[in-house]
Amino acid sequence: MTIIPKHPSPTLFKPLALGKCQLQHRIVMSPTTRYRADEAAVPLPFVKEYYAQRASDPGALLITEATNICPNSVGEAHIPGIWSKTQCEAWREVVSQVHAKECYIFCQIYATGRSADPELLASRGFEQVSSSAVAAEPGCQPPRALDEEEIQKYISDYAQAARNAIEVGFDGVEIHGANGYLIDQFTQASCNQRTDEWGGDIPNRARFALQVTMAVINAIGPDRVGMKLSPWSQYSGMGIMGDLVPQFEYLILQLRQLGIAYLHLANSRWLDQMTTHPDPNHLTFVKVWGRSLPVILAGGYDATSAPEVIEMVYADYDNVAIGFGRYFTSTPDLPFRMKNGIALQKYDRSSFYTCLTKTGYLDYPYSPEYLCRSS
């Protein structure tokens, strides 16, 4: 269904200070994996055009697809990395294109842990690892639990990836602590069965996420760091523990005290039929985060629901931004359309993950109205 904005949202188009960035509106391009990197995890040459297309409205924030921090963090083929010189140079071109359009861009950095394809890892000489030897799904082979030295190495790899991102010009990094990847595997008791300082209770399960965050802060500064969490997501065996709410309340409170640039809360919808969550607009955790630092909300918002959430649910908050993922893929001029009441374009989900091709990636047009304005 094509979604047409009812009317421009005044709050959605208010400026927002986010770390070192002065956003001119509160529409954010959320991270979306699209498998457009080569076998060496280097973004393909046309990736820079994709991000440049979506840097269509000056002062916007774009967040890249999930980007691997080191070779052993890679969970799937054709996902980009940011550890090698060649990868970094490709990202430098992306950043340059986005900055030329007067927009901001953060690099989302992550490690997959037990969500990685074990055959891919084995072909590259690595093992599937996690916080504990707990399989993501029944019948799957359990990963190996990381030891202390390996945990510390991952923490330092996150910090180095952040340094690499800033060196090539990114405005900051978003630490991916969501969707059942490695940080989430430490945070949630459904996976983390450790009895040492990295597990066993709420503070210990939050320790890895916080140690990674502090290492990244020490590397690049708190005002260049965001964190993405998805407390309600049940992807990859997550979101089913009894103390989920107090676990994430504790983690979010600690992140707030670290003074990072923003918190990103996502209700991930990886299946077409997944449309509801216990707390679809994240109120439980936004109340903990508070009103002083920016929070990005994502999870299936469209041209109707985004203004409603920011104008009604969060009428008393002046720190909320809305993330769009799939609609930003299909609608490169999304902010312009939202502001001018122009329908967002339908997306073709079947082409989102077609590896290495421009189809479903670069072939969504701008609106005629946007092209007239630009000319």
Curated annotation (Swiss-Prot):
Chain's role: Chanoclavine-I aldehyde reductase; part of the gene cluster that mediates the biosynthesis of isofumigaclavines, fungal ergot alkaloids. The tryptophan dimethylallyltransferase ifgA catalyzes the first step of ergot alkaloid biosynthesis by condensing dimethylallyl diphosphate (DMAP) and tryptophan to form 4-dimethylallyl-L-tryptophan. The second step is catalyzed by the methyltransferase ifgB that methylates 4-dimethylallyl-L-tryptophan in the presence of S-adenosyl-L-methionine, resulting in the formation of N-methyl-dimethylallyl-L-tryptophan.
Pathway noted in the entry: Alkaloid biosynthesis; ergot alkaloid biosynthesis
Binding residues annotated for substrate, in chain numbering: H176, N179, Y353
Chain residues that bind FMN: P31, T32, T33, A66, Q108, H176, K228, G300, G325, R326
Matches recorded under CDD domains: OYE_like_FMN
Keyword terms: Alkaloid metabolism, Flavoprotein, FMN, NADP, Oxidoreductase
Catalysed reactions listed for this entry: dihydrochanoclavine-I aldehyde + NADP(+) = chanoclavine-I aldehyde + NADPH + H(+)
Cofactor(s) named in the record: FMN
Signal peptide: none
Family of this protein: Belongs to the NADH:flavin oxidoreductase/NADH oxidase family.
Full protein name: Chanoclavine-I aldehyde reductase ifgG
EC number, as in UniProt: 1.3.1.100
Coiled coil feature spans: none
GO MF term list: FMN binding; NADPH dehydrogenase activity
Superkingdom of the source species: Eukaryota
Any GO BP: indole alkaloid biosynthetic process
Active site: Y181
